[in-house]
Design a protein with these regions (language model features):
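Conserved donor NDP-sugar-binding/catalytic core segment of glycosyltransferases
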Residues: 87-129
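Glycine-rich, basic loop-to-helix element that forms the pyrophosphate-binding segment
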Residues: 58-75, 91
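A short, conserved alpha-helix in the catalytic core of glycosyltransferases
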Residues: 92-98, 149, 153-173, 178-209
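Conserved catalytic-core segment of nucleotide-activated headgroup transferases in glycan assembly
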Residues: 280, 284-289, 293, 304, ...
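Acidic donor-binding loop of glycosyltransferase active sites
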Residues: 346-348, 416, 534-548, 561
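Acidic donor-binding segment of Leloir-type glycosyltransferases
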Residues: 22-60
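Short aromatic/hydrophobic "clamp" motif used to bind/position activated sugar donors
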Residues: 80
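Short, flexible, basic/aromatic active-site loop/helix in glycosyltransferases
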Residues: 112, 117, 129-155, 170
């Protein structure tokens, strides 16, 4: 990494900049190149105050642009980072840029969020309108607002803090000297990066404090370098005249919704769910998260609204780094209807999740916008509650089933199409309302597939259950297994039962007693869970009621597990017998577990089938094939 800092006098700013780099750049190896444009102050003795600098001192004053070009020739790093001397960097500023550019080969240049010393925002990426005018998006606003904190494509990034590969820099030929001595060279570079086939992307995690105007002044009508801004803006418009025709139009009071992220040609999806998906804690969150990733991958601009309007870590930042804009905070909570009204012509699809959330938004969207509503129920709540009523005889569950039926059918009637994770729900709905448009979709979507799964089941040990205990069917499953099935198994084989999941109840915790063979681990990290999947011989999913495709079952298949489940657990899963054993009732379930546990070869056979199976039924390609027509905009932008 080569950090190029162009300087002309202002030694106190340069020194403060260097000090901030030293303090806040611990996770990237770098060199610093000082591009000294014949300074007359103490800058020329900078080597007396700082060590290990590469100092490139011009013989004559070259101006900002040529000074940068000349110094960059000395860069030895894979990447070149141009950083103004009137900046101070913050923790993670450089690693976040490097991580982003290395995460995607289509990205050619990345840049930082620029903040004024008083804490106000200077720029969250730049907009160039078709008339040649420009905006520092978000200028003087609160830099912590959601709209300034997601990764996005931008027209340009101010050259105060930009990074690109040394190879691409050389391929382009550096800053175009047409714009010497300064101004618009950064905008021009962004257009050159796109011309070379790459994207220009804003990284909000890279926060740089910028004392704007220290080097070049702020008066465009004066005698300083700032006066070149007006002249060079004309040159930029002339050079890129054809590209400017594709830019958004400045109407005098334009809505920057699409211009700020270069999504003029992209369909926009608003995804609504109960909260930011906690993808490592529950299956419902995982499916929402996987669909968000798929929408981004397929080229959509994705907005996410969690009904609790909370910013929850690390989940929110994970989505924002994927390129998803999240609507959170008191301002959005109070003004969500105004936001929808203001941007109704920019949003193509509203993807509403879960009945208790979707019902809050569907009527407003249908009445006040032309946004296409697609509803995903996750499972049929009324069917799940009715099955619990059948199992327990609890009349309250019958009333809850009737309540959910009215809500769910109301949503299906209002939505353009309603999704459920299997043909079972589709058939149940059409038995009552054959006129509703229902689609059975792929419930869980995987981009990557596991390699090198350890298939030596003979050295694996124990039975594993995974599931969040905020979901009542999971708690019922573990209690039933522990009390009625596990004792039958332990009579025949010496084995432990590991219970994993978030929000463990006291009743579940109480199952772990000395000599019981039951170990309640509770919530574990994704890494710990992967380890448990790879070391447990059998995954058990003893569900007695529920509805829809069960995420815990699909996840176990993805992880190459040997699985024993019930008819409810395998419900809606195509060709389930390829990758799992199904048994109902305590004796039959116990028999199947013991039989599988004592047959490592059969466990291995099942494991070897899993990745092929996941590719067929739960890949991005399989999922998108089912829903693509529903997410095709009526009009091209």
């Amino acid at each position: 990494m080569s950090i190029v800092i162009p300087v002309y006098n202002q030694i106190h700013y340069t020194y403060a900049c260097l000090l901030s780099i030293l303090e806040n750049t611990k996770d990237v190896t770098y060199e610093i190149i000082i591009a000294d444009d014949v300074s007359t102050d103490a800058t020329k003795e900078l080597s007396l105050y700082a060590e290990n600098l590469v100092i490139c001192r011009n013989k004559t004053n070259q101006g900002f642009l040529r000074n940068c070009n000349q110094a960059a020739k000395a860069a030895r790093g894979k990447y070149v980072m141009f950083l103004n001397n009137d900046t101070q960097v913050t923790p993670g500023w450089l690693s976040s840029l490097v991580n982003l550019i290395e995460s995607d080969p289509t990205i050619g240049m990345v840049g930082s969020k620029l903040v004024y010393p008083d804490g106000r925002l200077q720029e969250a990426g730049g907009i160039i309108w078709s008339d040649g005018s420009g905006w520092n998006y978000g200028r003087l606003d609160d830099p912590e607002k959601p709209e300034y904190n997601y990764v996005k494509d931008v027209d340009y990034i101010s050259g105060a803090a930009i990074l690109l590969s040394n190879d691409l820099w050389k391929q382009i030929g550096g800053f175009d000297e047409l714009f010497a001595p300064a101004y618009c060279e950064d905008s021009d570079l962004a257009f050159e990066v796109r011309k070379a086939g790459y994207r220009v992307v804003y990284q909000p995690l890279s926060k740089v404090i910028h004392f704007e105007g220290v080097s070049n002044g702020t008066d465009v009508n004066g005698t300083g370098l700032k006066r070149y801004q007006v002249e060079n803006s004309k040159k930029l418009k002339e050079k890129w005249a054809e590209e400017f025709k594709k830019q958004s139009v400045n109407t005098g009071n334009p809505n920057p919704f699409r211009a700020r992220e270069r999504s003029q040609k992209k369909p926009v999806i608003l995804v609504v769910d109960h909260y930011v998906p906690t993808f490592d804690k529950d299956a419902g969150s995982k499916t929402t998260y996987q669909y968000l990733k798929m929408f981004v991958k397929m080229g959509y601009s994705v907005k996410f609204l969690g009904d609790n309007f909370l910013h929850e870590e690390p989940y929110s930042t994970t989505l924002q780094q994927m390129g998803v804009e999240i609507l959170y905070g008191p301002e959005y909570q109070a003004g969500i209807w105004d936001w929808l009204t203001k941007n109704k012509d920019e949003i193509d699809f509203a993807y509403l999740n879960r009945p208790h959330i979707a019902i809050k938004y569907v009527d407003f969207i249908k009445k006040n916008t032309n946004i296409k509503v697609i509803y995903y129920g996750h499972d049929l709540h009324f069917l799940r509650e009715y099955r619990e009523y059948e199992l327990t005889g609890d009349i309250k569950k019958k009333r809850e089933s009737d309540y959910w039926k009215s809500i769910e059918f109301s949503l299906m009637e209002k939505a353009a199409v309603s999704y459920y994770p299997s043909y079972v729900e589709e058939e149940a709905i059409h038995a009552i309302h054959p006129e509703y448009k229902i689609r059975a979709i792929t419930a869980y979507v995987y981009e990557k597939f596991l390699e090198n799964i350890d298939k030596d089941f003979a050295k694996r040990e124990g039975l594993l259950f995974v599931g969040g205990f905020a979901h009542p069917p999971n708690a019922d499953a573990v209690l039933w297994f522990a009390k009625e099935i596990f004792p039958l198994i332990r009579q025949r084989i010496d084995v432990n039962f590991y219970v994993v999941g978030s929000k463990v109840t006291d009743e579940i915790k109480a199952l772990e007693q000395p000599g019981s063979g039951i170990i309640v681990k509770g919530f574990v990290t994704e890494e710990e869970l992967a380890s448990l999947y790879s070391t447990s011989r059998i995954v058990v999913v003893p569900l007695r009621y529920g509805a829809g495709v069960k995420g815990k079952v699909v996840e176990a298949v993805y992880n190459g597990a040997a699985i024993v489940t019930t008819s409810i657990g395998s419900e809606g899963i195509p060709e389930a017998d390829r990758v799992m054993k199904v048994a109902d009732g305590p004796a039959a379930f116990a028999d199947e577990v013991v039989k599988m546990y004592q047959d490592p070869a059969e466990c291995r056979r099942m494991c070897e089938e899993t990745q092929k199976y996941i590719r067929e039924y739960f890949s991005v390609e399989a999922a998108w094939k089912v829903i693509e027509e529903d997410f095709t905009p009526k009009k091209k932008r």
